[in-house]
Amino acid sequence: GMDKASSGRVWVNNKEITKLNDKELIEYRRNDIGFVFQFYNLIQNLTAKENVELATQLCSDALNVDDILEEVGLQDRKNNFPSQLSGGEQQRVAIARAIAKNPKLLLCDEPTGALDYKTGKQILKLLQDTCRKEKMTVIIITHNTAITPMSDKVIHFKNGTAEKVEINENPISIDNIEW
């Protein structure tokens, strides 16, 4: 949904998104997809809470902003501006912003890249729990193969091509995974 397909077709949730025009694609991204990028894209003159609230104004089924900020461990930092937050805290604001939209599909590019081990596990648990509770599909792009046991499905890529697909019948809680 970020780029136009150069060939083939892409289906998501029984919808062929390759047939969507530009306006439909914008609506699809706005309503159905949440993004966590490696670069956080926070608005510098908005507080952490306001950055999350801004995203929730674009959708109709948003989650409670204060609850999500608490779940990412930022309840005491929600009134700080991005420049007053560490890189890990900024990453957690970006994650909260994406989750608060309550998207059908959440795409996370290295969501724990700037986080320490303990906070990384906290965020992965939040993603795992949110996926189950909200019936949200969460796709995590990562180089950390140690976390694959938490997943329902693992797709290994090499040189931009899906090389192997593994189905995990019994995903493990992130609480029980060490790396």
Language model regions located:
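ABC family nucleotide-binding domain
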Residues: 1-157
